């Protein structure tokens, strides 16, 4: 898959200003004055001097000075009034431009502090008297004014003090808007009111014309479909308009002003812009006479006479637009372009640098975390990948917010935003407005501001301040030189750190906030506020290349950390504020109606309000009725694009504790630091044109100002432009949005895995939860592939129920979310409600993502149209019918009892008559049970007789099994007779398979149920004629096959051996796919049920099962009892007995084993030990060897056996009858095979069922890495993310992604979960040529997933011939039991049959320690002794299972006995020696893994 083109950093470059190529500017283009109350005209000159005169000493106001005689409210003002000896000081000031203006004032208390750096103390009057403002006396400190002046050469546009005033708080006067009040009282004495000095900083200028900015140039010229250039961009580039100004001729150009802005689309998406404003010369010829007079270029007295010594300048802006808020990089780039335009000459045009930056500078990504851009040898900028966080990316600067407002004012603004007040933020620094406004809307996360939001409002849009809705607007402070703010607006001055509100409005009080969260927030912000002065605040555009490469992260990393800490403090407050809100969400549980999306129907407002503190009810009452809270509840109920961020907030809510007065030790906003060896991509400047030999490189481009952009000078991109990607997570397949986990869910799952790894039981359940998560990731593909999708959804619902019963530890809610999403897609709202009820029953509170999918399924799906009344009536009728049937049941029971009594009477009479006749040739009469009695399963040794009642081996078999029943051989034969009697006549069906000594043969049973009461071991009754003929037919066929097989043996032995087949009807049928025989018509319906019904309805099986022989259950072909119960999941999806070819032989068989060899110690590590050794890391493939503690990658071995013939022929189809003259004709009924013998026969060149001839089996072997469920889930999610969920149902999956495929198949088969994977194996294998399909349909060529059998083995598939053979294999060799693979190597003489029997005898007598000691003695001490690849525990366990059958060995009891034996041996030999000789048992974690994943595998 080709790598996607990285997203661009910059999308557009624009130039804004006054349009027109030398043409006069129309006067109607003037910007209209905004509506609102007007102020007096602002002064044209700043204040350059301030003085204090003493009226009592006869001093007069100096010439050119203005005296402050009244307060701001118009009250008479006199300092130190009424005091004896007072000088009656008066403050005066002077305006002008002959010197730099004053920029700051202060009050100095002499003797208590020192003057600030850069300030001058005004200690004398212009007449050389003391300028002390305080009254005379020893108790009053001498008070002086001090000031700071702007630097020399600051220019015309330097900020300075433009106005002064005095306020009297005792008269109710407050600080005027946009003024800064000095905190020191000018009248500190006991007499007289307190007086405070206020001053205003601004830009004093006159002779200015303001016009609306227009677009002068742009690149690229064409709009991109995903991101067209907004038309209002020029207005935002020059928010105060495109001005024409008249300056003195020798005035220097001011420093360019950097500003930022945000454009919000209709869908809420943001576009970030950065502009650089500068001045350039403007021709006088373009001005009309009226415009020239307004600028002061012409005399107002003498009409038409131009004034000299004047220069005309206009303001222009260059800007970039991006989807990324990389403001420092934009500032550096725009500053470079401006310097490039005012310097020169250059060899490259300006357009080359613009196009190079747009096309070749990408936004940082995980593959490119650092990008160093060199624009020139002296201009560099560094782009770093933003901190990975679930919080939305924005241009907010919480440090700027805290620096300019302080902790208390920041909290007050938080309260104003939460209650949706009108906020007007203003400053003289336009680059500060966007950062602070973005922080204001980000501090209320997860709430999203829904009202008008303009961080930098242009002058032409200032009418929004009169809007009757809440808003957050940022504007330049010069707006208030002409207009007063509206009365209902809260004004925030970032330059003076003040909040201004009209007196008639009740001021905001932080006391309405929750007490403890407020105190903690205030304390945290105060602590961080004190650390801000030590951080780096220098301009990044001036940073050198050495600084960017070495010290940038060290210096700026501290600032980033503080930024996250401030954001985390606000986030914790919001989490405490909304703690427990999910408990008051109201899920939809019925068909939607009008008003279903109302907040009152989605959220219990009153209940949530009552759960809060009474002192905060006022705040919550306002908050719950805001637009942003309503939108928040709707997003939580129905999902949105912010679902990942909302889910992260839910995790924060779970972490915080509002009652605590200290923050949690774990920060809510975690920083993911990049590694020190991260990759840095270096981007060089654009290449200069080559210089021809013999010629000099002469610069060609020189500019007097910023030039007009020329399209022919732009460089074309090197690669084809594509759609501009939108910032955010990469796309995923549209068909599978629900399976995708958020980053927060991945973090939680990782922490949960690390925690579970320390607890054995939790680790096993954690792995199990990830396995179920894998299946639900594949569920969409499975649902699309099955005929009945509704049944598949119900199957998934039953899987959820099974997960709850097994107490699975789910790391996330993906399982529920996927099913709810599918319910919504396929219109199953009722099932979605049931899934939600299951979640609540399991104690899981759905997060925002899951809750959204649930409500979508309920709201958007079509509900059943039928009324519930009809269903209720049908239910009542059903109950009536069932009730009547229950009343009739005693009559049936009485009639059956009477019939049984009559039969018993008749049987007793027959027995009495036969005893009288004295006949000894007839067989004993057995009691005939009712045909409806449930069958029970019983197994005997075929080569050896049943164990004696005192046999110690019976103690290991499971309790309740008939294999350990104490009885005589006639009793067993009587039980066989009873079962045959219940079934009726079994027709002869071809030649049987040869019976070896020590093996079992099976007969096929089709009945399941018998009447309660009879006993299979009863005696004293006679066989019926049909059952006797059937039994004789079986014995006869066994004697007629002497030409093809060995002699069967004694009738008693043959009858005992046949018991295995009588007790395995369902397993034989499922393996052999042989059609059932026709049953007599007089059998009851229960006896006519198909053998496959026992697989589909395991609840009807008897509760106790008999033990099986080693010939069957000890082999690798047996289906475990737990595998039968797993098929109950298929009841809701499909019935095997209804599928075509359900009784066909398997076309493909797959053998899988996870047993892996540790090459460090040459030991085999088994499945549960591999699981226990996995690390809780989704990127670690290694496991830990339990013997040597070495790490290695386990392998999953796979062997496929393809039985499909390449060319079926009549000769091959008859090959099954050529070996025996009594074999049935082709196409007739095949032999009666046990599943063991059937599977073993598949290794032979022919089958005796008449369906397949001499077809060779294609065997393929392979081994792939065995992945932990954590690793596999990560890989599967990546695959689905990149290629969509459809890839999981494609036949190319096994070849394209073999590791993922075979691991999925292993886990799904291990947990007995339905999937499409077996069918993909069949579809991916090479079948016969198409020409052969015309010869007729063959069941072997049908791509039916049911014709694929998957066997999971415990041991290795192919044994190592150089190693010592396992004991269970030797047992089968000595017992002459056919095996799948013949042992290829030599067998040591010490491993004899007597040794094996001795080990089994010790195990049966509960003397496991003697068995272990015997093996250790036989093997000898290392390194000279025999080396077993399997541990002692594994050898004894497998040997016991081979002798008794794996379903009849209680492994839990065996583990207890082995543990006791190990402890007993450890007291004499030592634990360390036993571990060296690998005699220890598996760890508790491994045992729990085996127990949690179900029954043990086959071996």
Swiss-Prot record:
Which residue intervals are annotated with compositional bias (Pro residues) in the record? Answer: 34-44, 1074-1083
Residue ranges annotated for the cDENN domain, each copy included: 390-526
Q: Determine the domain of life of the protein's source.
A: Eukaryota
- Molecular functions per Gene Ontology: guanyl-nucleotide exchange factor activity
Q: Which InterPro entries match?
A: cDENN_dom, dDENN_dom, DENN_C, DENN_Domain_GEFs, MABP, Pentatricopeptide_rpt, TPR-like_helical_dom_sf, Tripartite_DENN
**What coarse category fits the chief subcellular location reported for this protein?**
Golgi
Q: Name one GO cellular component term.
A: Golgi apparatus
Where does the dDENN domain start and stop, copy by copy? 528-644
Q: Which residues are reported to carry the modification Phosphoserine?
A: 951, 1090
Q: What region holds the uDENN domain?
A: 195-369
Keyword annotations for this protein? Golgi apparatus, Guanine-nucleotide releasing factor, Phosphoprotein, Repeat
Protein's UniProt keywords contain Repeat: yes
Q: Ranges of Polar residues compositional bias?
A: 933-942
* Low complexity bias spans: 729-739, 897-915, 1103-1115
**Start and end of every MABP domain?**
44-203
Region listing for Disordered, in residue ranges: 26-45, 717-744, 890-968, 988-1115, 1204-1226
What Pfam families is this protein classified in? dDENN (PF03455), DENN (PF02141), uDENN (PF03456)
- Where are the annotated PPR repeats, by residue? 775-811, 812-846
Where in or outside the cell it occurs: the entry states: Golgi apparatus
According to its UniProt entry, the function of this protein is described as: Guanine nucleotide exchange factor (GEF) which may activate RAB10. Promotes the exchange of GDP to GTP, converting inactive GDP-bound Rab proteins into their active GTP-bound form.
User: By what name is this protein known?
Assistant: DENN domain-containing protein 4B
Organism of provenance: Mus musculus
Q: Which gene encodes it?
A: Dennd4b
